[in-house]
């Protein structure tokens, strides 16, 4: 009877189980499909599926999700009705702009937005918005981006600007487009920078960075992971920073791939027309103005000559026609409006006149909307001051020196001498202390004279000098003091600009002693917050009457309309520099009339500088269209007389200008009284700078004299335009070809983990004559010389000129059929580099870009690369025509244990993307080198040691059929027993590392590299300098030669094959297609992140030739910043305290650029039709943040529900192990929907990366979970699920990091605390996700202890903004291995309450921390206590311990 009952109960129970299983399966399917539909924007379908799932198994979480979707659908319906009313077509250009934003724009700003859109609409690659300072270029760009993002015509924008403008741009974005995702790539926190960049590249938005950041990190900004990342828009503010194409700034900007480029500058031409050519060459990517040389010959020279006063009529006529032709060419790409233009247009509209020009972008409803405020009057006065008697005496002595006489007879630059003269005109104490003592201005002993620093200014020694003496020694200072007294009486506030900080020191002391309240801003104020504070204080507190600024810092991008008087203490060679300074006060928002005082000393070099300014200004006005034919004031001959001191009590320039313009001055009674008072001060006279070029030249002055001259001019203009057009087309074709067939050098190199060593390898020696490749082209550190020294090509042009590279073979005999033999012996093991024959052999391009922040050249390091066979004269090198031509880089696959490289696909045609094998150069120089060795296996017998031979002969050589093979090691002395058919055990490798003495780091210099290479026509060996940003200083502590030790084992081959299959799947990359254009080069079966075989040369050390092989986990490093390497090393030795409640505040305090709060996603706009400029978008952003916080609290509170969470975790893992669907990006939508949908994002990433490999958690949460997670294969792969923080937001994501042995970690990065784990976690420590916390009670201490050894070998590596690795890829370990210390883990009984689980975990962490502290491991103890304090924040004992540990570690 009992048996029957048992059977009956069993049957019923089995039936229930089967029903429950079927029901749960349907529930899972509905829920999963609902999430997919929601992420694809199919909200009604998602709602239906979620409702079906809710009927099967109701839950509060699902109910919230359904409610959120219903709210979104309702809002979408509401906005559909209002959509037509909310967006306006900007000036009928086709761009729809949010109405609330459109109505706030002035008419000229609407035209600017229409112009920017016309560039995109008409297929132009870029353009220049060159509006005068103060007309709102910032709001025009923000409005344009708002329309482009709303229309989903752009997703990714890179904004580059000077550091001082970042806060202003962030403020404007928050004001005008609160829903747009704007992040900063700036500040001291590399982690935050990386995270922000990765987020913008992945989700879309605007990333703001500075020019210095661009120089240091152009590689990272131009790539995402291993692929080139092409920005939709690259926008440069204050774009005259790239006016010289040979500078690092310009070259770095050229290196950023972009579909469209927009430049913003109020001064497109500052000194000469080549600067304008450089801007257009960048903006239009070389497709508009041809080459620099042609532009100079055909356009710049005729135009410049025509501006001189003594030009012949023919020259004037030619220059005028050429200038008009140039204006017509650039007109579609160039928009410039001055304040005067805007004011005149406004007056014409009021009077009923219509503007004829720019009909395309003209505002059709110009009289509607916001009215442009009237700008106040500006009087720009030149005040001609006297030299003091002391200044005049020193000036005469200096120009009579033999040094000056000799200078005038040579072609040497007189810049240094002119700088001395300029200082003399300002104040004699700006000279060096030594000069001041010699000139008798200050008493000093002979010993002081001998030991005084030549570069030290005498300003630092003015403490004992009276104010009266300081004022009497400078004529300008006498006038300034009198002027400030006058302006204080009249109630005006003043900006004083000087190019010299030391001059500001003198003025600050004198004025403060006269009871002036003043502020100061110069280059010593490095913190942005402090700069903003001072600017805001002056704008709001009228008690401060004077603001002292340096022209370089205070003259760009800031608004200081609180002042209505501006003093330019010393004129600049560049007229635009002074104009920028003036416009800090004279701009939109200024309500009072402005007076400018430019102080110039009579008869000195300053007068010559001013005349030169006027000449440059005429070029600017003519070329930019401000004036077709400006008046000619001076000739070039007059500009050369710089070292002549004329009458210091009068000025011929002032008299000339006064006679021409005195009657035209715009004035009133108060200004007349003020000028009369100025004449009573110590100065010669006044001229009107703002009236320059108001006089028109004679109407027939520039007409050609006869028909023949007219015909010549026409022919010359036509020829110039045709030549420039042909060059532009050729350059465009070359760009297209390079885009298809090449990739940036760092993309090939980034995938290779590298380490550095302390020792410097001996330069390789060769027996035969080496082939020398000239790699001096495209240098980042050395000037590029052409026929004209100022005609410097851009970096982009340099990369294009493949034909200019030449290969020189040095030798006394034909090397056509010979083999250049060389040896590569790496600690006793022979490395063979063999290559398969390539049918279509051609050209190999090898590019090694230098990190700009390092700036060390190969010559500086002292590496004799010439002896290696290749001359490398700088770090930014490019090898072209070197022998093998690769038109379409093929794919490479490791298909055998021998490691041979074979073409992956037949359509690749046997073409190759050559890998670079890295060798290491001395850390004394702290630089690195690439060694590319090619050889032919048929001539291995010819290999021999390198010997130095004299270079005798140069001849060009080419080769056609090189071969390439991955280096392999036949035997590893430290791990030979692991080869063959056995699997490499990481424990053995680590024991090798731990047991190896320091002598193993040292190898002999007597064993150089062995390599072989043969080509039909020549042989070469390249030693290239590599970028230093991909190495870590801490690697110097442990020198490990990493090599794929298991490549001959079946397991190794199996892993490679599996990874290849994964790579072929379309879902392998989690990046969405609409998140930017990714150009994926070399989708190799061998992943680029695969730890490629390294050949380490470690000479100058002991003769221990043993190999050390280990699996190393290393953080990927793409950023190269300006911090010292010592700081990086110190930082790397300290684990990031990610779980500390204080770390977020610390990181924010340490960063000068805190993150923006308001973010919004592209999907939100698609689903809601909400503009990023709308108020609703702003509210949605706030709601998202609130819901995220609530959701985080709920997750923390519900973490005790072990059964529910365990079920969900099992469900998530099942999804991840079986699902290969494409990854998705979460839209930052309203309510809890975004949070809950994003919770599942990690599933897709995990499923995508692992595919058939399912993970086995080292913290088994339940028996079911452990069973379901068994791998599909026979291999045992250990995983560790860790969590960077208990707090999560909607952007948390999972990534998988693997090593050679299949040991992986799954780590989850938290966005909430904005911190990451950069180093290995303390050994034995285990971190859980929320779901896994429930199962912690069921795990046994024995299981944890058994897995500690495996945990030790795979470090917990958190996301630092880099793209996740694929399943077969590895990273090198940064820090030296330490012997793991077992952590005592207390077994805890099974319980269902969250409180008990938290208490158990808390006690466990406290006990582990105290144990570590007792054993002297303070850092590990601190980590444990920080995690404990996150659980129980009120324990005073732990708080005290944390504070004590922080103090001890900081010391």
Curated annotation (Swiss-Prot):
Binding sites annotated in the UniProt record for ATP: 131-138
Boundaries of every Helicase C-terminal domain copy: 479-639
Keyword Cell membrane among record annotations: no
Protein's cellular compartments: Chromosome, Centromere; Chromosome, Centromere, Kinetochore; Chromosome
GO cellular component, one term: kinetochore
TPR repeats (start-end): 27-60, 1402-1435
Coiled coil: none
Phosphoserine carried by residues: 961
Example GO molecular function: DNA binding
Domain (Helicase ATP-binding): residue spans on this chain: 118-286
Catalytic function, reaction form: ATP + H2O = ADP + phosphate + H(+)
Chain location of the short sequence motif DEAH box per the record: 237-240
Name by which UniProt lists this protein: DNA excision repair protein ERCC-6-like
């Amino acid at each position: 009877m009992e048996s029957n009952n048992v059977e009956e109960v069993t049957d019923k129970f089995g039936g229930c189980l089967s029903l429950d299983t079927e029901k749960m399966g349907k529930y899972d399917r509905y829920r999963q499909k609902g999430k997919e539909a929601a992420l694809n924007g199919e909200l009604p379908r998602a709602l239906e599926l979620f409702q079906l799932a809710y009927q099967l198994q109701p839950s509060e979480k699902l109910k919230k999700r359904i409610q959120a979707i219903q709210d979104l659908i309702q809002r979408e319906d509401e906005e559909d009705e209002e959509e037509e009313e909310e967006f306006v077509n900007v000036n009928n250009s086709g761009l729809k702009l949010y109405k609330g934003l459109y109505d706030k724009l002035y008419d000229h700003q609407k035209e600017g937005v229409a112009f920017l859109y016309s560039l995109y609409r008409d297929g132009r690659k870029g353009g220049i918005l060159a509006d005068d300072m103060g007309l709102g270029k910032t709001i025009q760009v923000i409005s344009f981006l708002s329309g482009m993002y709303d229309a989903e015509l752009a997703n990714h924008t890179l904004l580059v600007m000077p550091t001082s403008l970042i806060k202003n741009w962030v403020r404007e974005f928050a004001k005008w487009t609160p829903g747009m995702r704007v992040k900063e790539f700036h500040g001291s926190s590399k982690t935050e920078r990386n995270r922000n960049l990765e987020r913008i590249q992945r989700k879309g938005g605007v990333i703001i960075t500075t020019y210095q950041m661009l120089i240091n990190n152009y590689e990272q900004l131009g790539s995402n992971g291993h692929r080139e990342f092409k920005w939709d828009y690259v926008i440069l503010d204050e774009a005259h920073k790239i006016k010289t194409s040979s500078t690092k700034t310009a070259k770095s900007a050229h290196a950023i791939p972009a579909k469209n480029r927009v430049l913003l500058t109020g001064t497109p031409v500052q000194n000469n027309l080549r600067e304008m050519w450089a801007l257009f060459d960048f903006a239009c990517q070389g497709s508009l103005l041809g080459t620099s040389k042609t532009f100079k010959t055909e356009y710049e020279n005729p135009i410049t000559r025509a501006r001189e006063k003594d030009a012949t009529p023919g020259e004037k006529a030619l220059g005028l026609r050429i200038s008009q032709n140039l204006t017509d060419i650039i007109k579609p790409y160039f928009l410039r409006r001055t304040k005067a233009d805007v004011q005149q247009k406004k007056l014409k509209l009021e009077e009923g006149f219509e503007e004829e020009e720019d009909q395309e972008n003209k505002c059709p409803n110009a009289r509607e909307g916001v009215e442009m405020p009237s700008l106040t009057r500006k009087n720009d006065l030149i005040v001609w001051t006297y030299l003091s008697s002391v200044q005049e005496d020193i000036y005469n002595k200096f120009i009579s020196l033999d040094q000056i006489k000799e200078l005038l007879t040579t072609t040497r630059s007189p810049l240094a001498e002119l700088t001395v003269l300029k200082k003399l005109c300002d104040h004699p104490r700006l000279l060096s202390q030594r000069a001041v003592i010699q000139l008798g201005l200050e008493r000093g002993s002979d010993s002081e004279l001998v030991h005084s620093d030549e570069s030290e200014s005498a300003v630092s020694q003015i403490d004992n000098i009276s104010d009266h003496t300081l004022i009497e020694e400078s004529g300008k200072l006498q006038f300034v003091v009198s002027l400030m007294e006058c302006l204080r009486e009249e109630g005006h506030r003043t900006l004083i600009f000087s190019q010299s900080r030391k001059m500001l020191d003198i003025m600050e002391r004198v004025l403060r002693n006269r009871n002036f309240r003043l502020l100061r801003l110069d280059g010593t104020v490095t913190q942005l917050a402090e700069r903003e504070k001072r600017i805001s204080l002056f704008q709001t507190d009228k008690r401060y009457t004077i603001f002292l600024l340096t022209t370089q810092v205070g003259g760009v991008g800031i608004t200081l309309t609180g002042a209505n008087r501006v003093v330019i203490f010393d004129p600049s060679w560049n007229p635009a520099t002074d104009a920028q300074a003036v416009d800090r006060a004279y701009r939109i928002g200024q309500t009072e009339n402005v007076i400018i005082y430019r102080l110039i000393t009579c008869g000195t070099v300053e007068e010559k500088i001013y005349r030169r300014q006027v000449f440059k200004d005429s070029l600017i006005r003519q070329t930019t269209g401000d004036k077709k034919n400006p008046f000619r004031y001076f000739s070039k001959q007059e500009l050369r007389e710089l070292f002549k001191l004329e009458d210091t009590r009068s000025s011929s320039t002032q008299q000339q200008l006064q006679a021409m313009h005195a009657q035209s001055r715009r004035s009133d009674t108060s200004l007349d009284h003020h000028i009369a008072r100025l004449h009573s001060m110590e100065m010669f006279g006044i001229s009107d700078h703002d009236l320059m070029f108001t006089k028109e030249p004679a109407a027939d002055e520039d007409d050609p004299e006869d028909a023949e001259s007219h015909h010549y001019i026409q022919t010359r203009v036509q020829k110039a335009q045709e030549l420039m057009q042909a060059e532009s087309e050729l350059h465009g074709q070359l760009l297209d070809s390079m885009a298809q067939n090449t990739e940036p050098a760092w993309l090939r190199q980034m995938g290779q983990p590298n380490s550095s060593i302390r020792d410097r390898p001996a330069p390789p020696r060769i027996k035969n004559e080496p082939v020398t490749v000239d790699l001096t082209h495209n240098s980042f550190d050395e000037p590029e010389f052409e026929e004209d020294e100022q005609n410097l090509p851009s970096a982009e042009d340099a990369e294009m000129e493949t034909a200019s590279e030449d290969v020189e073979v040095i030798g006394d005999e034909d090397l056509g059929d010979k083999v250049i033999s060389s040896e590569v012996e790496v600690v006793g093991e022979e490395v063979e580099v063999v290559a398969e024959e390539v049918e279509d052999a051609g050209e190999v391009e090898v590019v090694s870009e230098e990190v700009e922040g390092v700036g060390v050249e190969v010559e500086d390091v002292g590496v004799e690369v010439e002896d290696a066979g290749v001359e490398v004269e700088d770090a930014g090198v490019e090898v072209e025509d070197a022998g093998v031509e690769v038109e379409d880089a093929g794919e490479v696959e490791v298909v055998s244990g021998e490691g041979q490289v074979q073409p992956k696909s037949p359509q690749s045609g046997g073409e190759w993307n050559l890998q670079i094998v890295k060798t290491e150069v001395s850390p004394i120089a702290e630089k690195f080198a690439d060694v590319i060795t090619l050889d032919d296996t048929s001539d291995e017998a010819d290999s021999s040691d390198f010997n130095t031979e004299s270079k005798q002969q140069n001849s060009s050589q080419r080769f056609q059929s090189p071969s390439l093979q991955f280096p392999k090691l036949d035997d590893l002395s430290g791990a030979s027993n692991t080869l063959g058919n056995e699997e490499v055990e990481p424990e053995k490798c680590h024991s090798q590392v731990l047991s190896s003495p320091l002598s193993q780091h040292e190898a002999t210099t007597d064993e150089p590299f062995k390599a072989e290479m043969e080509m039909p026509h020549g042989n070469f060996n390249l030693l290239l300098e590599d970028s230093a940003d991909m190495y870590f200083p801490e690697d110097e502590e442990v020198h490990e030669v990493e090599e794929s030790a298991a490549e001959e084992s079946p397991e190794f081959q199996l892993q490679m094959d599996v990874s290849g299959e994964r790579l072929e799947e379309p879902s392998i990359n989690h990046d969405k297609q609409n998140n930017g254009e990714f150009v994926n080069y070399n989708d190799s079966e061998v992943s680029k992140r695969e730890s490629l075989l390294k050949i380490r040369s470690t000479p100058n050390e002991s003769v221990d030739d043993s190999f050390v092989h280990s699996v190393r986990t290393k953080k990927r490093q793409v950023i190269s910043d300006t911090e010292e390497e010592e700081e990086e090393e110190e930082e790397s030795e300290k684990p990031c305290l990610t779980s500390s409640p204080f770390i977020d505040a610390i990181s924010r305090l340490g960063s000068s650029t805190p993150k923006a709060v308001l973010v919004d996603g592209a999907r939100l706009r698609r689903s809601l039709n909400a503009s990023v400029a709308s108020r609703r978008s702003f509210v949605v952003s706030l709601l998202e943040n609130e819901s995220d916080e609530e959701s985080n609290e709920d997750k923390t509170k519900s973490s005790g529900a072990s059964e529910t969470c365990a079920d969900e975790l099992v469900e998530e893992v099942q999804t991840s192990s079986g699902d290969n669907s494409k990854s998705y990006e979460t839209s930052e939508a309203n309510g809890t929907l975004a949070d809950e949908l994003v919770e599942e994002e990690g599933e897709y990433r995990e499923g995508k990366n692992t595919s058939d490999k399912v993970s086995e958690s080292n913290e088994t949460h339940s028996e079911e979970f452990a069973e379901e997670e068994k791998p599909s294969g026979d291999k045992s792969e250990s995983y560790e699920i860790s969590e960077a923080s208990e707090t999560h937001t909607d952007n948390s994501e999972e990534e998988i990091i693997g090593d050679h042995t299949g040991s992986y970690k799954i780590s989850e990065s938290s966005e909430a605390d904005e911190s990451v784990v950069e180093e290995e976690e303390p050994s034995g420590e285990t971190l859980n996700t929320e779901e896994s916390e429930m199962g912690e009670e069921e795990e046994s201490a024995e299981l944890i202890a058994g897995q500690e050894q495996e945990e030790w070998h795979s470090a917990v590596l958190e996301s630092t903004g880099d793209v996740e690795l694929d399943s077969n890829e590895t990273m090198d370990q940064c820090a030296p291995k330490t012997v793991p210390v077992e952590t005592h883990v207390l077994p805890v009984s099974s319980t269902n309450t969250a409180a008990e689980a938290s208490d158990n975990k808390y006690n466990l962490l406290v006990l582990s921390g105290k144990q570590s502290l007792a054993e002297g491991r303070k850092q590990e103890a601190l980590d444990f206590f920080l995690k404990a304090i996150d659980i129980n924040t009120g324990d005073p004992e732990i708080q005290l311990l944390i504070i004590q540990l922080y103090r001890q570690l900081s010391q």
